[in-house]
């Protein structure tokens, strides 16, 4: 497998595919895992996000690089499903990361609105 280059837009391509799995776009829960998650949303994909985050924590705690990569991919995928459900795109998240770039973590946190 050739590693992706910096110019690859894999997150955007995955988001495009996920959008076709939305029930209102004709996604069939009988034949598509994503359509099934979206048809049971949000509980189904939120549960998966929690499971994948826990598995990532366990892999990191065990110091297993291959599992860390695999579990991160699983977590990101299910986060992309959540973005799809809420009509958001990975580009929205990337824009937020770009906005935060160069800020001190403490400074950025202090700028957030209080609930």
From Swiss-Prot:
Top EC category: hydrolase
GO molecular function list: ATP binding; phosphoribosyl-ATP diphosphatase activity
Disulfide bond positions: none
Protein family per UniProt: Belongs to the PRA-PH family.
Keywords attached to this entry: Amino-acid biosynthesis, ATP-binding, Cytoplasm, Histidine biosynthesis, Hydrolase, Nucleotide-binding
One term under GO cellular component: cytoplasm
Pathway field: Amino-acid biosynthesis; L-histidine biosynthesis; L-histidine from 5-phospho-alpha-D-ribose 1-diphosphate: step 2/9
Name of the gene encoding the protein in the UniProt record: hisE
Gene3D superfamilies attached to this UniProt entry: MazG-like
Catalytically driven reaction(s): 1-(5-phospho-beta-D-ribosyl)-ATP + H2O = 1-(5-phospho-beta-D-ribosyl)-5'-AMP + diphosphate + H(+)
A GO biological process held by the record: L-histidine biosynthetic process
NCBIfam families associated with the record: histidine_hisI, PRK00400.1-3
Name by which UniProt lists this protein: Phosphoribosyl-ATP pyrophosphatase
Pfam families xref list: PRA-PH (PF01503)
Classification via InterPro entries: HisE (IPR008179), PRib-ATP_PPHydrolase-like (IPR021130)
EC code: 3.6.1.31
Subcellular location: Cytoplasm
Species this protein is from: Bordetella bronchiseptica (strain ATCC BAA-588 / NCTC 13252 / RB50) (Alcaligenes bronchisepticus)
């Amino acid at each position: 497998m050739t590693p992706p280059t910096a110019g690859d837009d894999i997150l955007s391509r995955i988001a495009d595919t996920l959008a076709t799995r939305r029930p209102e776009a004709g996604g069939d829960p009988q034949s598509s895992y994503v359509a099934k998650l979206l048809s049971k949303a949000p509980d189904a994909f939120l549960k998966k996000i929690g499971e994948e985050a826990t598995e990532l924590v366990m892999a990191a705690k065990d110091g297993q690089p291959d599992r860390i990569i695999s579990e991160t991919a699983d977590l990101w995928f299910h986060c992309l499903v959540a973005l799809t459900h809420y009509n958001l795109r990975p580009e929205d998240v990337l824009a937020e990361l770009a906005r935060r770039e160069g800020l001190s973590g403490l400074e950025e946190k202090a700028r957030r609105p209080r609930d």
